[in-house]
Amino acid sequence: NVKGCWNLGSCGMGCPTNAKQSMLVTTIPTALDRGATLLVETRVEKLVLQQGRVAALQCVAVAPNGRPLGGSTRIVAKHVVVAGGAINSPALLLRSGAPDPHRLLGARTFLHPVALSSAVFDHEVAGWQGAPQTIYSDHFLDVHPIDGPIGYKLEAPPLHPLIFTTSIGGFGREAAASFAQFPNTHALLALLRDGFHAESPGGRVKLRKDGSPELDYPLTPFVMDGARRALLSMAELQFAAGAKQVMTGHELAPIFTSWAQAKARIATLPMQPLLTKVVSAHVMGGCGMAADPA
């Protein structure tokens, strides 16, 4: 999925040369060549539903930052495909009053919550070079039954200065010292497999008073137990690979210099939201289409 790569290391922030074969340079040009009309800076506010069908789309003009500009457009089409992602798709259907007999619209929205761990080595890692995220491990997905304690996938992500500096903890000189070691820094992610246990039900998309979406996602003790085990696994792996320092994604974690130190301290960290760094790049669900409510 790459063509003419310049190896600039900015894949995760968007390719500056369009070598990454995104929709911008593949399917959208093809659609335009075949007669499609692309409306930019236009947002669908509501589907007009009549007799169980979409009769029209009510749209508004928006600025690049999403701020409404006041103009409106009404679109009538034979077929309508809702493809706004796991946040905006259920929000649109909720605003439109779409049929929801089981009251599941917006529910079971999953994130693969991610715990983070970075490590510093004596040698240069250059985590921004080469194809991104080529190594992963499913080992910890299979340690327990799928409906048992939450499992997790380990991935070695690419590094970018902006993503790295906004993801690690610390302030002032401590943070500056960590930034200075960026060339020798390696990172691991643990993606928690949510949605297979009653204590990991996922989140729910709701509407604010202005009709915009919000996601309520509970980071339950069950989920955070998985995050703790993931932090331990990642620190152990990094020290076994020769790391001289490990920085765990937790506000109260010091910089660890040995596996024994990390093992003892991570086991006692309070696994609470905001203290524990949790991120997500996989937003899924929210628009279940099965006839069975289960």
Question: For each of these PLM feature ranges, what is it?
Answer:
Residues 1-44, 54, 245, 249-269, ...:
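Conserved redox-cofactor binding core of oxidoreductases
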Residues 30, 34, 83, 95-96, ...:
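Generic, well-ordered alpha-helical scaffold segments in large soluble proteins
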